[in-house]
């Protein structure tokens, strides 16, 4: 199950004691600030969690899989995320070994 903004708001309501409107507004503001920083071309560094960075990808040739026609893929800027050491180690501790036959 995915963690949603509504889940985060509910957690702030239950744990921190904010009312539901304040909790929802805080979550929205948090993501808005991250988005605005990235729009300005600034990296976002969340200590203990990870970094959001921007990467420019140049134009490159592509191909329509149905027709085989060559189509240029335009240059664009993409957001990348790199998990921090603390997050990586916490995730690694909670990995369950795969059972034989699982993919």
Curated annotation (Swiss-Prot):
Record-linked InterPro entries: Hist_DNA-bd (IPR000119), Histone-like_DNA-bd_CS (IPR020816), IHF-like_DNA-bd_dom_sf (IPR010992), IHF_alpha (IPR005684)
Pfam families, alphabetized: Bac_DNA_binding
An annotated GO BP: regulation of DNA-templated transcription
Span list, region Disordered: 50-72
Gene Ontology MF: a single term: DNA binding
Gene3D superfamilies assigned: IHF-like DNA-binding proteins (4.10.520.10)
UniProt entry keywords in alphabetical sequence: DNA recombination, DNA-binding, Transcription, Transcription regulation, Translation regulation
Origin: domain of life: Bacteria
GO cellular component terms attached to this protein's record: cytosol
Biased composition (Basic and acidic residues): 54-69
Cited HAMAP family: IHF_alpha (MF_00380)
Physiological role: This protein is one of the two subunits of integration host factor, a specific DNA-binding protein that functions in genetic recombination as well as in transcriptional and translational control.
Subunit field text: Heterodimer of an alpha and a beta chain.
Similarity annotation: Belongs to the bacterial histone-like protein family.
Protein name per UniProt: Integration host factor subunit alpha
Organism in which the protein naturally occurs: Coxiella burnetii (strain RSA 493 / Nine Mile phase I)
Taxon lineage: Bacteria, Pseudomonadati, Pseudomonadota, Gammaproteobacteria, Legionellales
């Amino acid at each position: 199950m995915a963690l949603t903004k509504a889940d985060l708001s509910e957690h702030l309501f239950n744990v921190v004691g904010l009312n539901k409107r304040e909790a929802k507004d805080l979550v929205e503001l948090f993501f808005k600030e991250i988005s605005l920083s990235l729009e300005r071309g600034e990296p976002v560094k969340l200590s203990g969690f990870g970094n959001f960075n921007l990467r420019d990808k140049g134009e490159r040739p592509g191909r329509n899989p149905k027709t085989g026609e060559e189509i240029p893929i335009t240059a664009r800027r993409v957001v990348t995320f790199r998990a921090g050491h603390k997050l990586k180690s916490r995730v690694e501790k909670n990995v369950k070994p795969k059972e034989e036959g699982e993919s």
